[in-house]
Amino acid sequence: MLDFKILEKIPNKSGVYIFKKGEEYIYIGKAKELKKRLTSHFKAKDGKSKLIVEEADDLQVILLDNEKEALILEANMIYKYKPKYNAMLKDTQVYPYIRISNDEIPYLEIVRNRKGEGEFYGPFTNVYFTRQLFEVLRKVYKFRTCKRDITKLKKPCMDYHLGLCSGVCINEESPEDYKKKINEVKNVLKGKFSNVISFIKLKMEQHARLLDFENAAKYRDILLNFNKVMESQGVVLPESVNIDLVVGKHKTFLVFKIRSGYLISKLVYEYDGHIVDFIELFYTQNTSDIPEKIIVEKENKELKNIAKILGIKIAQAKDDLELQLLNKAIDNLNYEIGLILTNKIILKQMKELLGLMKLPNRIEGIDISHLAGKNTVASLVVFENGEIKKEEYRRYKLGDILDDFESIRIVVKKRYTKHNVPDLLFIDGGIGQVNAAYQSLKEIGKERECDVIGLAKEEETIVTLHGEIRLAFDHPVLRLLVKIRDETHRVANEFTRNLSTKKSLRSILDEIKWIGPKRKKTLLERYTSIEEILSVSRSEIEQLIGKKATESLLNELSYRRNL
């Protein structure tokens, strides 16, 4: 428990404060007046504040110039460290983003979360819309999508030959011009869709003036495709304005994102907090796309303060059109709350919709992962009554098998020869993977004891032995299956990476002077990668293997990392 005296040296300035227990972040907060806010935590007689102070053994503060800096840092740290006493935004489905990397010559990609560095635009509700928008922008602006180190490239990739990349890697376009182009893409992703329309029309006219009608026709087709993509989202405002509508109740919040008059996203989150806290957290975690205005049901003093800090306008609906949109958002929120059912009801729905033999109280999910056919592994995750059971997870090493179907057959046979089958076996993949699992169950005489289904990644289509089933992206049954799929994928990929890095480290250690079998074993028991060894102090390694061996080890690893 922390002593009240720790507050004596803390100034009454803006900043972020961090309660820690050992190395674990248990609560992160921000304050305009740090000392005043922390004093209220320490004086609390009950509730969360009392628990935090009693559990923490360390308190750190970061002083900042103003409340806005504190707000943004707090949100980013909460997102990164996920302290247990901070309320978190919980996605009710997997939303795609478009990420622009931090490289000197950035590449763009569609991602399913905000992990890693770079600028994230979105989230978008509709996967199809996101892909179509990305492809149109790619054809227009010809940005790179490859992740290779372009400073070492001598030949362009296939995208260049297909006219999808400008060839900045081989100096076909200057870095300066490329960066200007990326800034244009950023503006479009912030909702300035008229920019891309003007750009396409300009290119079309330029080619027509040069009597290059073939390329003029290409840009005409791109423009038609772009208009079709945008029209699929529906025009909700006659003016090209960028606004959001935020409504919430019963620990559920909904955000309508309107860009250039188009409704491009309907986002739903579970969050145990007030609308002020939700808006603060949501917009400080999505700083790349903050609208001109946020419409809410009711204004209050706290919302005005957040608006001032973020430099945006938060207000009630001002006319009939905005009021109609607000009511539409409220109707959608009520619908979403109705969809957030208990796990029991979701599982009952799953049984009925998928035609399962029994209620899927126990679901086991399998995924295969490998690196170019090497270090093939399988993950098996367990969900009981819709909840994760991490303690029952299993991981399997499969050697260098190239065939995913064969890998699935091996794992299913190995697992269920010795263990009872679950109510439902979930496979990350399509009909081929589902059939492989079913045939393996048939070999051991258990095919009648459980159902087997898969989830095809492209359009989140549910695959059964009898056909395909498509559900709305926000349907609770699909949300649960996506959650299982993502968990199997995460566990399998994590296992593959760990095996790969350890195998790589093992082979490197074999070549280093002064590192024999005994020292090699000591290092492998303690560290899993080159990066991990280079991140610790020299003295720590010297205590394990001695000074000479440490010198030789660090020199070799540093050299290899810089290759």
UniProtKB/Swiss-Prot annotation:
InterPro entries: GIY-YIG_endonuc, GIY-YIG_endonuc_sf, GIY-YIG_UvrC_Cho, RuvA_2-like, UVR_dom, UVR_dom_sf, UvrABC_protein_C, UvrC
GO terms classed as biological process: nucleotide-excision repair; SOS response
Stretches assigned to the GIY-YIG domain: 12-87
Name of the protein: UvrABC system protein C
Subunit details: Interacts with UvrB in an incision complex.
Pfam families recorded: GIY-YIG, UVR, UvrC_RNaseH_dom
Main location group: cytoplasm
Function comment: The UvrABC repair system catalyzes the recognition and processing of DNA lesions. UvrC both incises the 5' and 3' sides of the lesion. The N-terminal half is responsible for the 3' incision and the C-terminal half is responsible for the 5' incision.
GO CC terms: cytoplasm; excinuclease repair complex
PROSITE patterns, sorted: GIY_YIG, UVR, UVRC
UniProtKB keywords: Cytoplasm, DNA damage, DNA excision, DNA repair, Excision nuclease, SOS response
GO molecular function: DNA binding; excinuclease ABC activity
HAMAP family: UvrC (MF_00203)
Residues of the UVR domain: 194-229
Cellular compartments annotated: Cytoplasm
